[in-house]
C-alpha cells in the first residue's frame, strides 16, 4: 500500500496541486528571475516540475491524472469492503500515508468526484482515522504554512 500511495496516488494528486497552486506562483515570477531560481533547484525532477507548473499541464495530462486518482479511490473502497483498514484489520502506516496524501482532503480538492456518494467506505475510514487521538491532536495544531502556499484550501492567495 505504501508503494502504491508513494508512486501512484501522490504523483497524480501532486500534479493537480502543482497545476492549481504552484503554477500561479511560478507564473508571477519574472522570466529571468525564474530561470535563475530554477538553476538553484538541485533536483532535476523538481526543476522540471517548476518549469511545467509555469507553463501548465495539458488538459489531457490532468484528465489522465484524475483517472488515476479515481482508480486509487476505487481500489481503496474495494479494500475497505474486505478489511477494516488498508493493510488488514489493524491501523498501519498504510492508513497514515494514504490519509495524509489523499484521503483527508480528496473531497475538497476534487469535488467533481462525488466522494461521499461514490466511496462511502472511504468516508467512514477517513472519519475513523480523523477521530484517532494522535490524528485529532495533529489536526488541531496551528497551520504554519504561508497562506499563499496552502494548497488544500483551493485558493492560493
PLM feature segments, named:
Residues 7-127:
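GST-like fold's C-terminal all-alpha helical module
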Amino acid at each position: 500500500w505504501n508503494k502504491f500511495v508513494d508512486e501512484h496516488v501522490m504523483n497524480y494528486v501532486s500534479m493537480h496541486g502543482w497545476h492549481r497552486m504552484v503554477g500561479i506562483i511560478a507564473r508571477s515570477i519574472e522570466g529571468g528571475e525564474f530561470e535563475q531560481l530554477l538553476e538553484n533547484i538541485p533536483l532535476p525532477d523538481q526543476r522540471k516540475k517548476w518549469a511545467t507548473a509555469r507553463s501548465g499541464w495539458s488538459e489531457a495530462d490532468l484528465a489522465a491524472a484524475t483517472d488515476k486518482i479515481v482508480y486509487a479511490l476505487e481500489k481503496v473502497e474495494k479494500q475497505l469492503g474486505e478489511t477494516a483498514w488498508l493493510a488488514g484489520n489493524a491501523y498501519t502506516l498504510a492508513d497514515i500515508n494514504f490519509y495524509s496524501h489523499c484521503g483527508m482532503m480528496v473531497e475538497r480538492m476534487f469535488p467533481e468526484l462525488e466522494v461521499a456518494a461514490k466511496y462511502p467506505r472511504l468516508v467512514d475510514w477517513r472519519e475513523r482515522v480523523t477521530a484517532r487521538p494522535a490524528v485529532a491532536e495533529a489536526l488541531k495544531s496551528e497551520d504554519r504554512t504561508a497562506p499563499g502556499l496552502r494548497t488544500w484550501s483551493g485558493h492560493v492567495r
